[in-house]
């Protein structure tokens, strides 16, 4: 199993060595950031989330999970939410977000250790879930489901393996999953796919990126 090779310390050591800028966050592919953010904005708009246009309302509170330096927080989430919380284990990445208008709480912890105490309208996860094992990802999604406000969404945006199986990357100690594996884990976590699509406009020589909007199969009642 590819995910059995994941080592959280190795992953933290890798990211701690990376520059706190967009190029560092995107592994040298900073030129895809604009297209990525626009694709995410368009995806949310199709779901009625956003601050522009008829029928597209801002949500009250979102959380950027595995936020890094806040590229997505600043480039997207603060435009569609009044407040954005941050979950990111590397402190140097979040230093520039402290005190920024619209940024709420900052949790410097890994996703596997985060226990949300706030109810969110939007939980955003991008290019970070590969650092969780399959079992951790299922547990994490179950926690996210319980932390959603009524009508809330969990968004997952990740690279897709094209080899038909999950692939371990020893450089940052992460796994690139295939679409089938994600769907299997979503089902185990009792999350259903409300909408999904492939990100358009990326270079052909990089892995395809798929975005999913998830909702709980059953509405959680306290």
Give residue ranges: language-model regions.
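Short catalytic micro-motifs in class I SAM-dependent methyltransferases
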Residues: 127-131
């Amino acid at each position: 199993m590819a995910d059995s090779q994941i080592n959280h310390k190795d992953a933290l050591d890798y990211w701690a060595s990376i520059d706190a800028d967009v190029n560092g966050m995107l592994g040298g592919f900073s030129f895809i950031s604009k297209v990525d953010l626009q694709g995410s904005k368009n995806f949310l708009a199709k779901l009625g989330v956003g601050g522009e246009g008829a029928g597209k309302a801002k949500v009250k509170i979102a959380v950027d999970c595995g936020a890094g330096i806040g590229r997505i927080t600043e480039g997207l989430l603060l435009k569609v939410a009044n407040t954005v919380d941050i979950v990111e284990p590397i402190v140097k990445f979040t230093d520039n977000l402290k005190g920024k208008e619209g940024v709420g709480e900052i949790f410097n912890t890994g996703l596997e250790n985060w226990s949300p105490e706030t109810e969110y309208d939007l939980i955003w996860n991008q290019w970070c879930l590969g650092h969780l094992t399959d079992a951790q990802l299922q547990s994490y999604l179950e926690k996210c489901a319980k932390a959603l406000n009524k009508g809330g969404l969990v968004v997952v945006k990740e690279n897709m393996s094209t080899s038909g199986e999950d692939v371990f990357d020893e450089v940052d100690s992460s796994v690139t999953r295939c679409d089938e594996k994600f769907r299997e884990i979503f089902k185990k976590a009792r999350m259903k796919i409300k909408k999904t699509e492939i990100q358009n406009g990326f270079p052909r020589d990089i892995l395809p990126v798929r975005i999913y909007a998830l909702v709980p199969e059953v509405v959680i009642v306290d």
